[in-house]
């Protein structure tokens, strides 16, 4: 082995570039060892100021102790070769076919991949290597305190699998519930319990004349059914136009509508206006528990069900006859009895809600919309003379009329319906029947006959402002036939008044 001075000269950077080309490989290999010592001694072992160790060596972590093992290629960037003892031969370090080229001026020798097995292996520990070659930075102990949190999480990861899985299932259930809540909207249920078609309110003829609540309510229903203000396609009509169609003459303020306006009168006026505009419709009593034309077999719950369904139907309109007044139901609300059911999911039973009926008012002396309990309306309709209940003044309670008549009640709910079926034209009827009807104008059973023109003298017509035109009598036979056909097809036979009074 060459001495230290020769090795120092051989490895000196200033002279390494002028190394003789005919130097033997053994001498070159031996000269690489001091070079390694020099580079190793100059390499900083202690960590840098930032607390990190040199990045040229790979780091391997274990649970007990963390080492950084420098492999045989760890210092290739420093171009050094490592060997265990100086007695290694060329055949041990280099393969037979390995030789230095004549033009190679570098001072470093390439080492095959099998050199690591010769330098150190699993049987040679780090202590033997350090005693033979001095203290080398091949391995050092690293402070692993900064990795404790990570290793702790890794250690307990397998133990928390079930807990994490249960948490995931819980979160999935919450997420599914939230998605269902997002898809579900209480608006649909609220719309079923709170119904108010603003078009019905738009069509309320307000204000009315002094006693024209009947014709004002009728025009409100007709405009909703047939005009563009409601569900139809015709121009809306006014009270004055309707009164002119019915034969009344101004001044309308002087007409006393009360004595000749009844339930069947409104039905007949409805048919006359329909005939004038060539539209189809029918009318019938929805609920009248007492008196003439009462709806036998109809119950309050059944009437409520029909009324609420009809208020959702744009082909139906209603008039409520109360104490000395007519006005139009336009909506309702089914209020839950319990507070926690305000936005309940799904429909509620009739026992869980209380119904309020919204009623449009034509008189300017009262609120535009009344809101009355259905129970109070039922009480009003079920009272009989001389007892009565004024639905617009519930604070007065049950009252008694000064009358000798006992029993019966005129109060009721009347329905008006727009029909889509086509009635037979004039040419479809057998002319002999029409001629016979015109020659023998008899009262046909099933036709409502209330305070009609047939029962009112010409003198009374003049006093009431009624225009008793000849066209009314000319059209009477046709109207009788049309009314018969209309009632037979619609199936409503509930509003007969044989006494001619309502």
UniProtKB/Swiss-Prot annotation:
Region spans: Disordered: 1-32, 438-460
Keywords: Cytoplasm, Nucleus
GO CC term, one of those recorded: nucleus
Superkingdom per UniProt: Eukaryota
Cell compartment(s), UniProt: Cytoplasm; Nucleus
Signal peptide feature range: none
Keyword Cytoplasm among UniProt keywords: yes
Positions with biased composition (Basic and acidic residues): 12-26
Family designation: Belongs to the BIVM family.
Descriptive protein name: Basic immunoglobulin-like variable motif-containing protein
Organism: Mus musculus
């Amino acid at each position: 082995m060459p001495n230290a001075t020769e090795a120092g000269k051989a490895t000196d950077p200033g002279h390494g570039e002028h190394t003789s080309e005919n130097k033997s490989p053994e001498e070159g290999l031996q000269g690489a060892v001091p070079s390694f010592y020099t580079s190793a001694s100059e390499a900083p072992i202690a960590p840098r100021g930032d607390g990190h160790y040199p990045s040229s060596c790979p780091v391997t972590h274990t649970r007990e102790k963390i080492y950084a093992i420098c492999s045989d290629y760890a210092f290739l960037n420093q171009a050094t070769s490592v060997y265990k003892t100086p007695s290694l031969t060329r055949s041990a370090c280099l393969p037979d076919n390995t030789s230095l080229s004549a033009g190679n001026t570098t001072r470093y020798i390439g080492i095959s991949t099998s050199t690591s097995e010769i330098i150190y292996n699993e049987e040679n520990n780090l202590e033997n290597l350090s005693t033979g070659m001095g203290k080398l930075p091949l391995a050092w102990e690293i402070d692993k305190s900064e990795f404790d949190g990570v290793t702790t999480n890794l250690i307990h990861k397998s133990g928390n699998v079930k807990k994490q899985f249960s948490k995931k299932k819980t979160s999935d259930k919450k997420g599914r519930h939230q998605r269902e809540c997002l898809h579900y909207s209480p608006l649909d249920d609220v719309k079923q319990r709170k119904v108010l078609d603003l078009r019905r309110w738009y069509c309320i003829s307000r204000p009315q004349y002094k006693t024209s609540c009947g014709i004002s309510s009728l025009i409100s229903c007709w405009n909703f059914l047939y005009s563009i203000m409601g569900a139809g396609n015709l121009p809306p009509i006014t009270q004055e136009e309707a009164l002119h169609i019915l034969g009344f003459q101004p001044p309308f303020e002087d007409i006393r509508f009360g004595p000749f306006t009844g339930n069947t009168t409104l039905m007949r006026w409805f048919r006359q206006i329909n005939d004038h505009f060539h539209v189809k419709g029918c009318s019938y009593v929805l609920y009248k528990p007492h008196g003439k034309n009462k709806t036998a077999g109809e119950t309050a719950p059944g009437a409520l069900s029909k009324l609420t369904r009809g208020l959702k139907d744009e082909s139906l309109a209603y008039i409520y006859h109360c104490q000395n007044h007519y006005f139009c139901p336009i909506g309702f609300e089914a209020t839950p009895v319990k507070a926690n059911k305000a936005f309940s999911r799904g429909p509620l039973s009739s026992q869980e809600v209380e119904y309020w009926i919204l009623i449009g008012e034509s008189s300017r002396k009262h609120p535009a919309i009344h809101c009355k309990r259905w129970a109070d309306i039922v009480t009003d309709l079920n009272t009989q003379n001389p007892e009565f209940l004024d639905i617009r003044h519930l604070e007065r309670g049950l009252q008694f009329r000064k009358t000798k008549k006992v029993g019966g009640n005129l109060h009721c709910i009347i329905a008006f319906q727009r029909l889509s079926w086509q009635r037979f034209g004039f040419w479809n009827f057998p002319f002999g029947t029409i001629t016979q009807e015109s020659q023998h104008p008899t009262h046909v059973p099933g036709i409502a006959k209330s305070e009609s023109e047939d029962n009112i003298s010409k003198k009374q017509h003049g006093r009431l402002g009624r225009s008793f035109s000849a066209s009314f009598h000319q059209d009477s036979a046709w109207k009788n036939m049309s009314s018969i056909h209309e009632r037979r097809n619609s199936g409503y036979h509930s509003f007969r008044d044989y006494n001619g009074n309502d």
